[in-house]
Swiss-Prot record:
Region of interest (SR/KY domain), residue spans: 118-134
Gene Ontology CC entries for this record: nucleus
Keyword Nucleus: yes
Protein name: BEL1-like homeodomain protein 7
Recorded GO MF terms: DNA-binding transcription factor activity; transcription cis-regulatory region binding
Biased composition (Polar residues): 363-401
Keyword Lipoprotein in record: no
DNA-binding positions: 285-347
């Protein structure tokens, strides 16, 4: 039997029997006598112990709030058993909740013990750090990176004015490469995102809307974070190079990148034009040109005449000539192929022709004596044409053009062209007086009528003393080429 004591009296109220609606049955009986204070009151500690053993927490709070037991009226005394039952049921429910909470705390404590003692704990933490705590790791390392970048920027700002032209061009080429890499990173990220959206849509079609989100959200966030880190690193390098070049910082969007590229291209074009005007830089090889530069042709021609017996260079000679002339190896080889056909072969043919003609003249001296009347006839025709200043009568198969240029009173020069239709030959006779005097005499006329090949020409020179010197076409061609 459970007993309740009332302050100031020793009446004992019997508790009613257990009702089936209640969840617990209390059959304990308390026979312990409680010590009283000097005011004949029950000590509060004993009362709290009894009520706590019965689960009467709410009544214990009411006792503490009220401070003492108070007398009730008769109607309250009649209702006391019903209230006592209701209080008992609430106390039983609170005890159940406390028991459940205690069990839950015991289970959680058991789980924590097993997790801390597990051998998979470290591996799971590393996986979570890779997938979830990437931003935290970046934030931890970000201040050091910012400090390093600040130091680099200060050093570059101090050395901006001291950058030579070669390093500036190298930095510009590196900047263009980084910009192309940045575009490639953006393009690959767009491609990855598009493929991920295709996978998500296929999951949604089969399993329903939003079915792929638990599987693809984490992967998409991780890959996008990696792409973002890579893009930030490349952008940082681009900004550092721009600051080192002394240019203004452009925005990180596409417009800023396009404007910076246009600026770099414009700057390079202006520098190349300025160098070409000064003559420091040769024009690009891919531009159409009429032949090779004169300096390069002089070097190649000198090598050709030095190695006249073997006019085509070896591979090592080609590399050496390409370095000396500033041309490519293919251009050097093409020039020697053309020169061997156009210059070297005709010169060799003329040399052999001269040798054969000299041998014939030595073997046939009568032929040289027969040629002397022809020379005298040509000289007479020239004197007559100078007096008549017109065509020579009696010569039907020849056309003659005469041009006389006078310089001063004591010297003159006469040029006469004659082309014979029968033999197809051409003779040029120069009459010079007072050859001891020095000075240049202008000469004109007759050159535009030379339409025959140079291999069939014979040049005869007559001075005032009527000495004849025959000049072969090979010697003239050699002088022209050299």
């Amino acid at each position: 039997m459970a007993t309740y004591y009332k302050t100031g009296s020793s009446e004992i109220y019997s508790r009613p029997e257990f009702v089936p609606g209640n969840a617990m049955n209390y059959t304990n009986s308390f026979t312990e006598t409680f010590p009283r204070d000097s005011t004949n009151n029950v000590s509060p500690s004993k009362e709290i112990q009894v009520l706590s053993s019965l689960g009467g927490v709410s009544q214990m709070v009411e006792i503490q709030d009220s401070g003492s037991w108070r007398d009730q009226e008769d109607n309250d005394r009649n209702r006391f058993p019903v209230m006592r039952r209701l209080g008992l049921s609430s106390q039983i429910e609170t005890s159940r909740g406390n028991n459940n909470n205690e069990y839950a705390t015991q289970v959680v404590s058991g789980f924590t013990r097993t997790i801390h003692n597990s051998k998979y704990l470290k591996a799971a933490q590393e996986l979570l750090d890779e997938t979830v705590n990437v931003k935290k790791a970046l934030k931890q390392f970000q201040p050091e990176g910012d400090k390093i970048n600040e130091v680099k920027e200060k050093n570059l700002q101090t050395n901006t004015a001291e950058i030579p032209q070669a390093e500036r061009q190298e930095l510009q080429s590196k900047l263009s490469k980084l910009l192309s890499i940045l575009d490639e990173v953006d393009r690959n990220y767009k491609q990855y995102y598009h493929q991920m959206q295709i996978v998500v849509s296929s999951f949604d079609v089969i399993a329903g809307c939003g079915a792929a989100k638990p599987y693809t959200a984490l992967a998409l966030q991780t890959i996008s974070r990696h792409f973002r880190c890579l893009r930030d690193a490349i952008s940082g390098q681009i900004l550092v190079i721009r600051k080192s070049l002394g240019g203004e910082q452009d925005g990180s969007d596409g417009r800023g990148v396009g404007i910076s590229r246009l600026r770099n291209v414009d700057q390079q074009v202006r520098q190349q034009r300025a160098l070409q005007r000064l003559g420091v830089m040769q024009p690009h090889t891919w531009r159409p040109q009429r032949g090779l530069p004169d300096s390069s042709v002089l070097v190649l021609r000198a090598w050709l005449f030095e190695h006249f017996l073997h006019p085509y260079p070896k591979d090592s000679d080609k590399i050496m000539l390409a370095r000396q002339t500033g041309l490519s190896r293919g251009q050097v080889s093409n020039w020697f192929i053309n020169a061997r056909v156009r210059l070297w072969k005709p010169m060799v043919e003329e040399m052999y022709k001269e040798e054969f003609t000299d041998a014939l003249q030595e073997n046939d001296p009568n032929q040289s004596s027969e040629n002397t009347p022809e020379i005298t006839e040509i000289q007479e025709l020239q004197t007559e044409s100078s007096s008549n200043n017109g065509h020579v009568p009696g010569v039907a198969s020849s056309s003659m053009r005469q041009n006389t240029v006078a310089h001063g009173g004591d010297r003159f020069m006469m040029v006469t062209d004659m082309t014979r239709n029968g033999n197809g030959g051409m003779s040029l006779t120069l009459g010079i007086q007072n050859s001891d005097a020095r000075g240049d005499v202008p000469m004109s006329g007759g050159i535009d009528n030379y339409k025959n090949t140079i291999s069939g020409t014979d040049l005869q020179y007559l001075n005032s003393r009527n000495h004849q010197h025959q000049i072969g076409s090979s010697q003239l061609l050699h002088d022209f080429v050299a």
